[in-house]
Curated annotation (Swiss-Prot):
SUPFAM superfamilies: Winged helix' DNA-binding domain (SSF46785). The gene is fkh-5. This is Putative forkhead-related transcription factor fkh-5. It comes from Caenorhabditis elegans. The lineage of its organism: Eukaryota, Metazoa, Ecdysozoa, Nematoda, Chromadorea. Its main location: nucleus. One of its GO terms (biological process) is regulation of DNA-templated transcription. Transcription factor. Binds to DNA sequence motif 5'-CTGTTTCA-3'. Regulates expression of a class of small RNAs, known as 21U-RNAs, perhaps acting redundantly with fkh-4 and fkh-3.
Length: 461
């Protein structure tokens, strides 16, 4: 009998009947069902069956000591609005959202707020519960707003399908990825490197990879996994996360990785064999990380010591480079850099929004103008060309400041930069065409070189 009564009542559940001008909204097991408003005239026999079924159904739950479902009566007979579906935005993009209702469509405020809070939080995994706020009419629900610090420097991002890689007639250096990874490891302060540091090191010193297909990065990862000359370490720290690589025998790199063909490539390099001797001795160092985290790895055509130097010089004058603002950077593809850059000592810090949200965390910010100077500075087109052309003078200034133990030697004062770099004359054609003849002296020296047999040459002789 109880089962039959239950079936009868379940068949008429979710129906609002205007019997005595009353409406019922029924929710069952914490799930809000749709409210259906029916305005019709029932026969007396049907009304009697509904009343009796409802009465027996309540009696059954009371006798069996079960929990009654939640019923709430509306304050208006023409209420036909379903319960609101609260919409959430993503947690990282919380924005205020509000849902308003008229006074004729509201429940009793206290019961309604409790009901909505319970409805949205039960059987749902959320990091934080919905906070319900009320206005003066008690008719508004506001999703809380999460305030995030906007980064001062945004990471450059260019979709791969829109990347236009320029074709340059540059010969690929005959250096194995195994050797390039080993050279990166030798110049690391702690002897450990990540794949990101290898990419930055290669882009910084070899112009060919700035215009090559990015599949070379897959080859680097493959070599690191298969090569038995590297140890793979798991590091969980503030600076590095994931796999890092370390040479097993750093003193045997010349014997194990440099053959006659590789030595001949080093001899033909415009920077000379001395450049590779310094690399094997760990006297070159790694490129500065923030530039490659923001610009260099995403737009490799702007990698290199020249663009890295002007990036930090702009930061030293409190100039924040806008996203994808390429006016300050030039492509240096005609010749390799002469390797006049000083050796920097920086701890590897990966890019994060929290890192660049505060100026105190940005390396070299404001060091060129000094404390107490709030003026904003920028570079003209002529000054940008002049800086790139006279990059040797800028590197020499850095080395002199380092010898004098200046704390800001990596980004010298603007006064020194103006005297040593900006005041030098440049050719008018360079300003008009926007091109720079890189290392013309190095070209002449390369043409005059008389190479010996690579098999008879030791890299240290």
């Amino acid at each position: 009998m109880q089962y039959a009564l239950t079936v009868i009542f379940q068949s008429i559940l979710f129906v609002q009947c205007q019997v005595g001008e009353a409406a019922f909204v029924i929710s069952q097991e914490h799930e809000v069902s749709k409210s259906i408003s029916i305005n019709m005239t029932l026969f007396p026999s049907i009304k009697w069956i509904i009343h009796k079924s409802f009465y027996l159904y309540l009696t059954y739950f009371v006798m069996s000591q079960q929990t009654l479902p939640c019923f709430q009566a509306a304050d208006s007979y023409n209420y036909s609005h379903s319960l609101p579906k609260v919409q959430f935005a993503r947690f990282s993009k919380y924005t205020p959202q509000s849902i308003s209702y008229s006074s004729t469509q509201m429940y009793q405020q206290k019961e309604y707020s409790d009901h909505i809070t319970e409805m949205t939080n039960v059987h749902k995994s959320r990091k934080r519960k919905l906070m319900v706020t009320e206005d003066q009419w008690g008719s508004q629900i506001t999703i809380p707003k999460v305030i995030q610090n906007r980064p001062l420097i945004e990471k450059w991002f260019v979709q791969k399908r829109f990347k236009m890689v320029k074709v340059r007639n540059i010969q690929r250096p005959q250096l194995s990825y195994q050797l390039l990874s080993a050279l990166t490891c030798l110049n690391s302060p702690d002897g450990m490197i990540s794949t990101t540091e290898i990419y930055s090191f290669i882009l910084h010193h070899w112009r060919y990879y700035r215009y090559a297909n990015e599949n070379w990065k897959n080859s680097v990862r493959h070599v690191l996994c298969k090569c038995q000359l590297f140890d793979v370490l798991q590091v969980e720290g503030l600076s590095r996360k994931g796999n890092v690589y370390k040479l097993k025998r750093p003193d045997n790199v010349e014997k194990e990785m440099i053959d006659v063909k590789t030595l001949g490539c080093m001899q033909k390099d415009s920077r000379g064999i001395d450049f590779y001797i310094k690399m094997l001795a760990g006297q070159i160092g790694l490129p500065r990380h923030l530039f490659y985290s923001i610009v260099g790895n995403e737009m490799p055509e702007y990698a290199g010591p020249e663009n890295s130097a002007i990036f930090y010089h702009l930061l030293s004058m409190r100039k924040i480079i806008p996203k994808l603002e390429t006016r300050y950077f030039l492509e240096h593809w005609q010749m390799e850099h002469k390797a006049t850059e000083p050796m920097f000592f920086e701890e590897f810090v990966p890019y994060s929004t929290s890192l660049v949200s505060c100026v105190e965390n940005i390396s070299s910010y404001g060091e060129g103008v000094g404390p107490g100077n709030d003026e904003l500075y920028d570079l003209s087109d002529r000054q940008i060309i002049c800086f790139h052309k006279n990059i040797r003078a800028y590197h020499s200034l850095q080395k002199r400041c380092h010898k004098m133990n200046y704390s800001n030697w990596m980004t010298p004062s603007l006064i020194y930069v103006q005297e040593a770099v900006m005041d030098k004359e440049i050719v008018e054609d360079d300003i008009r065409n926007g091109t720079i003849e890189c290392e013309g002296v190095a070209r002449k020296e390369e043409a005059k070189k008389n190479f010996q047999d690579p098999a008879l040459i030791s890299i240290y002789n």
